[in-house]
Regions:
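Conserved N-terminal beta-strand and adjoining loop/helix that marks the start
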Residues: 1-16
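Short secondary-structure boundary/capping segments
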Residues: 7-8, 21, 66-68, 86-89, ...
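Residues that recognize and position ribonucleotide moieties
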Residues: 8, 29, 96
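Structural detector for helix-capping/boundary residues
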Residues: 13, 34, 48, 93, ...
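Nucleotide phosphate-binding site architecture
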Residues: 16, 37, 104
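A conserved beta-turn-beta hairpin within the catalytic core of GNAT-like acetyltransferases
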Residues: 24-28
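The catalytic Nudix box helix
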Residues: 31-64
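Active-site-adjacent beta-strand/loop module that shapes the phosphate/pyrophosphate-binding cleft
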Residues: 59, 65-101, 112-122
């Protein structure tokens, strides 16, 4: 089973999303991240992937949601920026800060939709 870490950064009511690189279908918006390497925790993978993909130093905190399907375990890891760093995509993808609301962002990938619903409901209370 494939294990994937997705980084969740919420700042000022907005959530960081990244587009999938053109060479990695399906296309759409997702929480940035990637596959865990052998022996790596989801937090370590989230930190490594954001550095590789977005040249962004973050501090990984806790796993706030986990989604299991027959093919994948997806860990959503809360992260905060390290210092004054900002994301700068370096693998051809785009990023955007999406306002947190009950509506899914247009083009959001299916596996991320359940988590989007979870965080939008959790933060609206």
């Amino acid at each position: 089973m494939m294990k994937v870490a997705a980084a969740v950064c919420i700042q000022n009511g907005k959530v960081l999303l990244a587009s999938r690189p053109e060479n990695k279908p399906p296309s759409g918006w997702e929480f940035p991240g990637g596959k865990l390497e052998p022996g790596e925790t989801p937090q370590q993978a989230a930190k490594r992937e954001l550095l590789e993909e977005l040249n962004w130093e973050v501090l990984p905190l806790d796993i706030i949601y986990q989604l299991k399907t027959p093919k994948i375990t997806l860990y959503f890891v809360r992260v905060i920026p390290a210092g004054n760093s900002t994301p700068a995509p370096c693998e051809g993808q785009q990023i955007k800060w999406e306002t947190l609301s009950p509506e899914f962002p247009c083009g959001m990938l299916e596996n991320d939709r359940n988590f989007w619903k979870f965080i939008s409901l959790s933060t609206s209370r």
